[in-house]
Swiss-Prot record:
Gene of this entry: hisF
Catalytic residues as annotated in Swiss-Prot or TrEMBL: D11, D130
Pathway: Amino-acid biosynthesis; L-histidine biosynthesis; L-histidine from 5-phospho-alpha-D-ribose 1-diphosphate: step 5/9
Record-given protein name: Imidazole glycerol phosphate synthase subunit HisF
Source organism of this protein record: Prochlorococcus marinus subsp. pastoris (strain CCMP1986 / NIES-2087 / MED4)
InterPro entries associated with the record: Aldolase_TIM, His_biosynth, HisF, IGPS_HisA/HisF, RibuloseP-bd_barrel
């Protein structure tokens, strides 16, 4: 059985790790390189580094920061934010990233998914989907871009199927309603997307306890759990989470 993964997420703005609630009210959580080293040494299975301002301000992700961070860790590392060309992907992979995460650019130009997966391999291409519940529907969600500021009107499930067809290797699925709340993952959203595709789904948005993480693996059918506030706020450690999940007989890589 493939091991389930715990993935700390480093949201970066202006060179600092930040975290908010529902994509707003951002607060400083530390230096990205220091936190990357800390989580790598603590037993994280992978890391995700997202320049959350890049898409909004049309800037390239800071390649030098990526390079310094990637050189500091020995685990797989995904980079996202403002990536809108094959050249940008190439620059980031050369800077040390193992994978790139595409969001706004993939919605605007879906061909970038197929072209990048052909050029670099599907294993390098992660499609980030920021999902928000439709007010009038219990089990329907819409895709948002530009850091959660713009509603595309796209149905999340249809888009997830489309990106898989185009060559995405993974989906990074964020519940905007749960982001930063520590009230638990959106299990219905995660399970619905996981059941609709045959590629790994990384669940994001809402982790507040070890039980939440257990639930997103067992009920949500996620292949990986993204962790941010829970770790940045020192509510739990990676070791504590892994110990709990191993006791529950889940396939987790021990520290």
């Amino acid at each position: 059985m493939v091991a389930l993964r715990l993935i700390p997420c480093l949201d970066v703005a202006n060179g600092r790790v930040v975290k908010g609630v529902n994509f707003v009210n951002l607060r400083d959580s530390g230096d990205p390189v220091e936190l990357a080293c800390k989580y790598s040494e603590a037993g994280a299975d992978e890391l995700v580094f997202l320049d959350i301002r890049a898409s909004v301000e049309n800037r390239k992700t800071l390649v030098d920061l990526v390079s310094r961070t990637a050189k500091s860790v020995k685990i797989p590392f995904t980079v996202g934010g403002g990536i809108n060309s094959i050249n940008s992907i190439n620059d980031l992979l050369r800077a040390g990233a193992d994978k790139v995460s595409l969001n706004s650019s993939a919605v605007k130009n879906p061909d970038i998914i197929s072209k990048s997966s052909t050029n670099f391999g599907t294993q390098c291409i992660v499609i980030a989907i920021d999902a928000r519940k439709k007010i009038t529907k219990y089990n329907e969600w819409e895709v948002y871009v530009k850091g959660g500021r713009e509603n595309t009107g796209l149905d999340v499930i249809s888009w997830a199927k489309k990106v898989e067809e185009l060559g995405a290797g993974e989906i990074l699925l964020t519940s905007m309603d749960g982001d930063g709340t520590q009230n638990g993952y959106d299990l219905l959203l995660t399970q619905t997307v996981a059941n609709a595709v045959n590629i790994p789904v990384i669940a994001s948005g809402g982790a507040g306890s070890v039980e939440d993480i257990y639930d997103v693996f067992t009920k949500g059918k996620a292949s990986a759990a993204l962790l941010a506030s829970l770790l940045h706020d020192k509510k739990l450690t990676i070791d504590e989470i892994k110990s709990f999940l191993i006791e529950k007989k889940l396939p987790i890589r021990p520290n």
